[in-house]
């Protein structure tokens, strides 16, 4: 069975090439070709024909195809639906900011977490993405859009920490000086709160930004919209976050979806401020995107402003997320589901 060569690190490639009797620099040449987005060994013209044929007999190169592409008329945001090698689909979104271009990528096909307000979880988890499939979303978004990618957010379909090992390998690949060379400080990873994996991530001491999907400061309301809270309640999660902050020195961003009558009361704002005190935390307030199946609605502008004011009066930095691409199915998972239902 052929192996996925793009999921291999440079060191692994060098070992594989040594086993073939090839010098290490050949492995580096191939690594560079792969991270430029080539889709076949035949284009690697600085390799001998014999070596190219040998590699083709041992390995395959992942390369997603564009199943659908949407460009926002409002702000130029580009949303991709990628068709993978096995026919499954995932989404990526390219967003343009004054400080550079950011790609939001998926970590899984579907999602096992069951958050009530998120379209990605409808239908559950299909499978986890390979490191190469994570990398391809960055690489091919850049190649197709013509926009140099400077920042990555793992906030698309799936729970990144549920795919821990493959995500860690992807980070190593995309951070490689011989590859795309995107710095860890330019990468954000979002989790709904897998405490054991947050603890594991803290041990790695990576300089990325950890974003925690909190969405409520109390167990009663959080458990209703996020089943993960029944496994790891709010206080258990926040204890892990404090430990992460202490070990890494990296400020955590807390994602907080504003849901009418569920997460937007003044009392919840006060409780949230109390629980986040002393963490150097930042709260990223997010107006709820419409997901018909959820039966939930976004908070009013007045409720959002009131909530933000209470946080800031209590010393918590809070910002309202700028909504991009609202005219091209802004909610996670919507594009994939619409495509697959056709």
Protein language model regions, located:
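Canonical Radical SAM [4Fe-4S] cluster-binding loop centered on the CxxxCxxC motif
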Residues: 96-133
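Phospho-regulated, low-complexity intrinsically disordered regions of nuclear gene-regulatory
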Residues: 84, 95-96
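Conserved AdoMet/S-adenosylmethionine-binding subsite of the radical SAM
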Residues: 142-151, 156-321
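Auxiliary Fe-S-binding modules of radical SAM enzymes
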Residues: 1-88, 242-250, 256-342
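A short loop-to-beta-strand scaffold at the N-terminal edge of the catalytic core in hydrolase folds
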Residues: 89-94
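Short linear Ser/Thr-Pro motifs
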Residues: 72, 106-107, 120, 190, ...
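Conserved alpha-helical substructure of the radical SAM core
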Residues: 121-151
């Amino acid at each position: 069975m052929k192996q996925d060569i793009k999921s291999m690190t440079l060191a692994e490639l060098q070992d594989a090439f040594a086993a073939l009797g090839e010098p290490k620099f050949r492995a580096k040449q191939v690594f560079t070709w792969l991270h430029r987005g080539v889709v076949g060994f035949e284009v690697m013209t600085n390799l001998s024909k014999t070596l190219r044929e040998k590699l083709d007999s041992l390995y395959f190169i992942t390369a997603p195809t564009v199943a659908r592409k949407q460009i926002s008329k409002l702000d130029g945001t580009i949303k991709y639906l990628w068709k993978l090698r096995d026919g499954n689909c995932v989404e990526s979104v390219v967003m343009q900011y004054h400080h550079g271009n950011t790609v939001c990528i998926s970590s899984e096909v579907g999602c096992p977490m069951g958050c009530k307000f998120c379209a990605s979880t409808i239908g559950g988890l299909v499978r986890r993405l390979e490191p190469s499939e994570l990398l391809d979303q960055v690489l091919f978004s850049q190649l197709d859009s013509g926009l140099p990618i400077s920042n990555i957010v793992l906030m698309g379909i799936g729970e990144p920490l549920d795919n821990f090992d493959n995500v860690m390998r992807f980070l190593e690949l995309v951070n490689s000086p011989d590859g795309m060379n995107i710095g860890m400080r330019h990468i954000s990873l979002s989790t709904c709160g897998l405490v054991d994996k947050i603890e594991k991530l803290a041990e790695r001491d990576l300089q990325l930004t950890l974003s925690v999907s909190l969405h409520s400061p109390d167990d009663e309301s959080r458990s209703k919209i996020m089943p993960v809270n029944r496994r790891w309640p709010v206080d258990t999660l926040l204890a892990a976050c404090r430990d992460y902050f202490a070990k890494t020195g990296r400020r955590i961003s807390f994602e907080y979806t504003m849901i009418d009558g569920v997460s937007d009361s003044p009392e919840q704002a006060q409780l949230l401020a109390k629980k986040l005190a002393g963490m150097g935390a930042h709260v990223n307030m997010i107006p709820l995107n419409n997901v018909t199946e959820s039966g939930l609605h976004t908070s009013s502008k007045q409720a959002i402003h009131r909530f933000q004011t209470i946080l800031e009066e209590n010393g918590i930095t809070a910002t309202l997320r700028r909504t991009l691409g609202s005219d091209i199915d802004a909610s996670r998972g919507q594009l994939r589901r619409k495509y697959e239902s056709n």
